[in-house]
Amino acid sequence: MTCTALVLGAGGFIGSHMVRRLKSEGYWVRGVDLKRPEFSSTEADEFIQGDLTDPLFVERILKYTGSTGNFYKQDVPRKYWNPFNEIYQFAADMGGAGFIFTGENDAEIMHNSATINLNILNEQKKLNDLLDHNYTKIFYSSSACMYPAYQQETTEDPKLPEDIAYPAAPDSEYGWEKLFSERLYLTYNR
């Protein structure tokens, strides 16, 4: 049976490259993002544009209903629902350094990104419970912004092991949200 993967944030730089990598390894891939990839066409078997802050949208994209791409068929019987083998979570509300470090957009960025991650975890848990399933592997992509700023001041030692993230002192609200979401995914995995 073909392995299936869901790539969230598949329109971005890292997500689009992950889609390419998974396809080269033989996966069936569904890509999801607010926008299509800017610099090349997607290699995803199915690419869906939509807003991950919408829990109903997230509920639908988490169901793999066949390699023919049945996302747009509204009434796929439950017997055809399957969870993805793997989920790669790169999606975030992030407009670049000039956007996130101004202070004007911090609350909205934190809210939207936290909502995306809460929706993914809540809806995956519901699907797992409904299908009596718990083997979907989820990869969450964090950011170096979650480390304390003083740990990032030198280029002499670029290593940032996880144990130096605490005591927490991220350099921005974006970093705080990434740290919060890391904790969400760790807790979900218990």
Residue ranges with predicted function:
Residues 5-25:
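N-terminal Rossmann NAD(P)H-binding glycine-rich loop of SDR-like oxidoreductase domains
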Residues 27-36:
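Conserved glycine-rich Rossmann-like NAD(P)H-binding loop of the short-chain dehydrogenase/reductase
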Residues 43-54:
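Rossmann-fold cofactor-recognition segment
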Residues 52-113:
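NAD(P)H-binding glycine-rich loop region in Rossmannoid oxidoreductase-like domains
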Residues 54, 116-120, 137, 180-181:
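Conserved cofactor-binding/catalytic machinery of classical short-chain dehydrogenase/reductase
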Residues 89, 118-173:
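Conserved Rossmann-fold NAD(P)-dependent oxidoreductase catalytic core, especially the SDR/UDP-sugar
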Residues 108-119, 172, 176-177:
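Glycine-rich NAD(P)-binding loop of the Rossmann-fold in SDR/ketoreductase-type enzymes
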Residues 169-190:
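Active-site Tyr-X1-5-Lys
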